[in-house]
Swiss-Prot record:
It holds the Pfam family Ribosomal_S13. GO terms for cellular component: mitochondrial small ribosomal subunit; mitochondrion; peroxisome; small ribosomal subunit. PROSITE patterns: RIBOSOMAL_S13_1, RIBOSOMAL_S13_2. Component of the mitochondrial ribosome (mitoribosome), a dedicated translation machinery responsible for the synthesis of mitochondrial genome-encoded proteins, including at least some of the essential transmembrane subunits of the mitochondrial respiratory chain. The mitoribosomes are attached to the mitochondrial inner membrane and translation products are cotranslationally integrated into the membrane. Keywords: Mitochondrion, Ribonucleoprotein, Ribosomal protein. Component of the mitochondrial small ribosomal subunit (mt-SSU). Mature N.crassa 74S mitochondrial ribosomes consist of a small (37S) and a large (54S) subunit. The 37S small subunit contains a 16S ribosomal RNA (16S mt-rRNA) and 32 different proteins. The 54S large subunit contains a 23S rRNA (23S mt-rRNA) and 42 different proteins. GO terms for biological process: translation. Belongs to the universal ribosomal protein uS13 family. The gene is sws2. SUPFAM superfamilies: S13-like H2TH domain (SSF46946). One of its GO terms (molecular function) is RNA binding. It is found in: Mitochondrion. This is Small ribosomal subunit protein uS13m.
Length: 119
């Protein structure tokens, strides 16, 4: 098991997929980190030397990921709601925010936009 930022990863997991499992890191950011440390995209977690693992941990600790990224998104939504914008009201009602039709297919938006609705 390889330990990075409080998460244990299996030795057989790809490094790129392990990095993408952190909230706020996508394919491009993980590919950029791999290129920075000269890690092959198909490399597994178990093949990394401890020096690279500590460098990855240091790199990830400087980035806005996990709870910090979630808090940033929620703060942006709260800011929209407090300003009283159209998007903020749509978030508050749990409706689609980006102009989608609401006649039939809003079930997904109602699932994803679950926020405190009153207050």
């Amino acid at each position: 098991m390889v330990f990075i930022l409080g998460v244990n990863f299996n030795e057989h997991k790809l490094v790129q997929k392990a990095l993408e499992s952190f909230y706020g890191l996508g394919q491009q950011a993980s590919a950029r980190i791999l290129a920075k440390y000269s890690i092959h995209p198909r490399a597994k977690m178990g093949t990394l030397p401890p020096k690279i693992v500590t460098a990855l941990t240091a790199e990830l600790s400087t980035m806005t990921i996990e709870n910090d990224a979630r808090r940033l998104v929620l703060d942006n939504i709260k800011r929209l709601r407090d300003m009283g914008t159209y998007r903020g009201r749509r978030h508050a009602m749990g409706l689609p925010v980006r102009g989608q039709q609401t006649r039939n297919q809003i079930a997904n938006a109602r699932k994803l936009n679950k926020i405190e609705r009153h207050g």
